[in-house]
Amino acid sequence: MADAIGIDPGSYKTVLACVKQRGIEIVLSETSSKWTPTIAGFTAEERLVGDAAINQMKKNFKNTAMFFGRFMGLNQDCVKQLEEENKFITYKQVEMENKKIGFELTIRGEKHILTPE
């Protein structure tokens, strides 16, 4: 069992590691990769992350969230940067309380607002 874990969430890939007796060990993904794609897809039946989300992305593009790490720490006052980042997303961006950023996705037939944090 690990005493501590480390998570490095990047815009494109996420790396997980844990501390073991012999040192730090990278946690392998379902496909035995040292990193997992930073992406989540929502279908009528399930939530998919990583490689599974990539596999369904073509048929479910509007409900597949990716690049959300690029929006962390931004708010609606960051107009120029938001305009640039919005070129990379296919889901709807909405303004929330306190000028926070939210993303509208359909999950199991219902609209939900998710935040990048």
PLM feature spans:
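N-terminal phosphate-binding loop and flanking beta/alpha elements of the actin-like ATPase fold
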Residues: 1-37, 42-117
